[in-house]
């Protein structure tokens, strides 16, 4: 009778238990960084436009017919609420947050994400969120203008 050491076999492929735990800790630490949180905010907003089209197309073919306006409204709520979750920890006076914003997200595309999110929260009359996002938007605009002047 031969007894196989499965952990040893899978270890040959780089899947050791210790390695997995280390990677999980690294990923958890990454999720707490300003760069990651800003990136998740941006990705959710930008991908929401594609998601919206796909969702509406899918439900338009359903039987019985569903109210596409309600589906669109629910989808927007989910996207922008979740996107805000990722950016709500932004600290205006934090060097770490400002540096992540300046180095990775001070461009027109990120500015578009902020504007879309501000417009959504204006439509739902959540003005505190709008004011918070406007401060970040102002920093992005300042960084964009500074980068233009350096060129």
Question: Which ranges hold each PLM region?
Answer:
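Long, low-complexity, acidic Ser/Pro- and Gly-enriched intrinsically disordered regions
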Residues: 2-122, 138-151
């Amino acid at each position: 009778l031969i007894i196989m050491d499965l952990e040893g076999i899978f270890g040959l492929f780089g899947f050791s238990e210790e390695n997995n735990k280390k990677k999980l800790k690294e990923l958890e630490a990454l999720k707490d960084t300003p760069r990651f949180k800003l990136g998740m905010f941006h990705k959710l907003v930008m991908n929401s436009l594609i998601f919206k089209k796909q969702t509406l197309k899918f439900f338009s073919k359903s039987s019985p017919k569903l109210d596409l306006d309600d589906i669109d409204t629910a989808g927007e709520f989910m996207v922008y609420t979740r996107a805000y979750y990722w950016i709500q920890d932004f600290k205006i006076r934090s060097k770490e947050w400002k540096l992540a914003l300046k180095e990775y997200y001070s461009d027109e595309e990120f500015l578009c994400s902020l504007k879309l999110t501000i417009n959504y929260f204006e439509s739902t009359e959540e003005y505190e969120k709008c004011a918070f996002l406007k401060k970040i938007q102002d920093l992005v605009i300042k960084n964009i203008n500074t980068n233009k002047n350096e060129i």
